Every structure is written in structure tokens, then in C-alpha cells.
């Protein structure tokens, strides 16, 4: 089910591209890309349980097809398998990057959950949420690939540039994803649209809508979100 679930595989692709850019000649970059994809897939399995999602990449989600318990357990397995593979890569700095990213991703999910229906959520706080829950794994992908390719860190400026690229790429990715939840087509995207609003998630389109709405429009949106949060 997981291997046939589709998806863009952007995060592992960034690992391979960054390794190629730095002329890495070994084989551990493939294992590193696998680790990144395992971590990402684990977060998706858990997210679908938290969000009670029924559609992912055009297919029925694992929690809908089997059960929440099965999804959580398989997600846990992928996390543990990812860390087992980290040991095989044999780099403490890379393990540090990936373990820290995994921890911050969980913090970001909790931060988002605790702000459902929060009409006062600022754009700055929203950006912090997407940095934690989404962009950090993109950053970890390019940063860890850079360290794998240059373990002595002789190209510090290039390593930092690749790390920043991953971070900014991840932020841009989430901004577009949040916009598509309002403006996209569910058939094209392979997932439901309107879920963020239905779940009371304060994403940038909704934050900006509240900022630019008339008093009547703000009241209507506020009542809807209060009803959802209850």
C-alpha cells in the first residue's frame, strides 16, 4: 500500500540532487533519501489519523482502509526503521540533524493542533508552524545530504546555502499547499479540498481573509470557526 501510494517524492529527490551537486561518489545517499521518505510517510500516516482524513494522493487513506491503530503502528514502524537506517549511514552529525527535525515536526503538529480555530493567530505564528511541521524536513534533506557529501565541512558556505534552500523550499511548498486547499481541484490534487477550513486550521488564506474582510464577513467567518472548534 505504501510503496504504491504515489506522491512526488520531493524530499528524497532533494537528497539525491544535493548529493549530485556536491559530486558525492558513494552509495549512502540512497539510504539517506530512503530515511527522509520513511520519516515523511510516517508523519502522513499519523497526520491522517489526527485529521481524520479519508483521501490521500487520490487513494483511500490507510486509517480509512484499515484502522487508526494500524496507521499509528505502521507510522511508528517507519520511524524506528528510519532511525535504524541512520545508524547504517554512520554519521552522528546527520543523525543529530534528522532526530532534531523529527522532534520539531512533532512540536509543529502540536502547535497547529493547539491553535485550531484561533482567530487571533498571527501570520508570524503561522509561519513558525509551517516551518516546524513542513519546512524542517526539507531543510534536513538538503542539510544532511550536504554533510554526507562534505563530512569535513570544508565548503561551509555551500553547505549553509543548501540548508537554507531546503528550508525556503519547504516554506514555499506549504504556502502553495495551503492555498490549493481553497483554490485547487480535488480530482487533480488527489486529496480533498476545503479540509483546512473544515478542521479549523488557521492557514494563510484564512488569516488574510480575516484581515481584509468587512465586519460582517469577519463575523460570519468567526461564527463558522467557533462552531467548528466546538
Locations of regions flagged by a protein language model:
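Conserved small/polar residues in nucleotide/adenosyl-binding loops
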Residues: 226-230
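Mg2+-dependent prenyl diphosphate-binding active-site environment of isoprenoid biosynthetic enzymes
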Residues: 1-218
